[in-house]
């Protein structure tokens, strides 16, 4: 059996009884970082010393078959460094391979940065989408593509890129789009900062430290205004996108007329 198990995202007290039992008895652990797993076993006072198999983004495709074969004969515990395996962490190829081979996969649920950030954000939680890590480049175009997304959106971002990401968010989705920066969740210096995109961009202009989750409100049903749309087109053009292509992209995401956007942006240049 393959067992995906969630580990703490910052507070060791969040370890579940089921995880403790599994760590104390399992013979094999597939770990994102074996050093992190060894530290976890030591911190929890676990005397069991299972076989540790590295399973990370660079080898998970190649290692999946081996681990599935082991899971056919005995329990294999799968751990990421923090949170739930397969959620923006190694695990998906392994689960897919196990399912295809008819090997049972189960879960020991627990901490999740995505759900923790969503729950504490104060933004609607009935419908949401997790978008993973923001791209390093082309974020204005990326955010513009999400301009009409009605669901609350959750992203991961590095602390070093957070100021630029928030500025791009304000440019693409408007300065008044509601958002929440969740920093160091469940840890000693946890911070949840709510505000508009422009307010958060100003607050974090000098950067931030720690693990970051960014939660962004979905689009309201109201149609975007033409001036806002023209502003989005000009922002894309400033990123190197051709005016015609930028107008088409914003028209697709906002429902505004491509011709009106093109002519308005042309006049504003």
Question: Predicted regions: what is each one?
Answer:
Residues 1-5, 72-80, 128, 151-155, ...:
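Generic beta-sheet signal
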Residues 1-57:
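Glycine-rich, flexible N-terminal cofactor/catalytic loop recognition
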Residues 23-29, 102-105, 152-153:
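Short active-site oxyanion
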Residues 31, 80, 107-110, 155, ...:
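General beta-strand structural signal in soluble alpha/beta enzymes
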Residues 53-61, 133-137:
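Conserved helicase motor
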Residues 64-72, 145, 205:
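Short amphipathic alpha-helix with an adjacent loop that forms part of the alpha/beta core around
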Residues 75, 152, 156-269:
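A contiguous loop/helix-start segment that scaffolds small-molecule binding in enzyme catalytic cores
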Residues 93-149:
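Class I SAM-dependent methyltransferase SAM-binding "motif I" and its flanking Rossmann-like core
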């Amino acid at each position: 059996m393959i067992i995906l198990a969630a580990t703490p995202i910052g507070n060791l007290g969040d370890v579940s009884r089921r995880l403790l039992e599994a760590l104390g008895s399992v013979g094999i652990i597939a770990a994102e970082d074996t050093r992190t797993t060894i530290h976890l076993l030591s911190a929890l006072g676990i005397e069991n010393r299972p076989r540790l198999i590295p399973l990370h983004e660079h080898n998970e495709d190649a290692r999946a078959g081996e681990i599935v074969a082991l899971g056919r004969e005995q329990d294999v515990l799968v751990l990421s460094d923090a949170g739930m395996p397969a959620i923006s962490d190694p695990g998906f190829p392994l689960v897919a391979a196990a399912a295809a081979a008819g090997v049972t996969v189960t879960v020991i649920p627990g901490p999740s940065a995505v759900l923790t950030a969503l729950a504490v954000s104060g933004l609607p939680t009935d419908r949401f989408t997790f978008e993973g890590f923001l791209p390093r480049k082309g974020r204005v175009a990326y955010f513009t593509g999400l301009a009409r997304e009605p669901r609350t959106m959750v992203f991961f971002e590095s602390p070093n890129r957070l100021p630029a990401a928030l500025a791009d968010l304000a440019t693409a989705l408007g300065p008044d789009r509601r958002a929440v920066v969740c920093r160091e969740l469940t840890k000693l210096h946890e911070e949840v900062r709510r505000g508009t995109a422009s307010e958060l961009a100003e607050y974090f202009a000098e950067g931030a430290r720690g693990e970051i989750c960014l939660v962004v409100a979905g689009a309201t049903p109201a149609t975007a205004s033409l001036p806002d749309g023209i502003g989005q087109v000009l922002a894309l053009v400033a990123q190197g996108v051709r005016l015609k292509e930028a107008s088409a992209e914003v028209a697709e995401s906002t429902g505004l007329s491509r011709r009106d956007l093109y002519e308005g942006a042309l006049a504003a240049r």
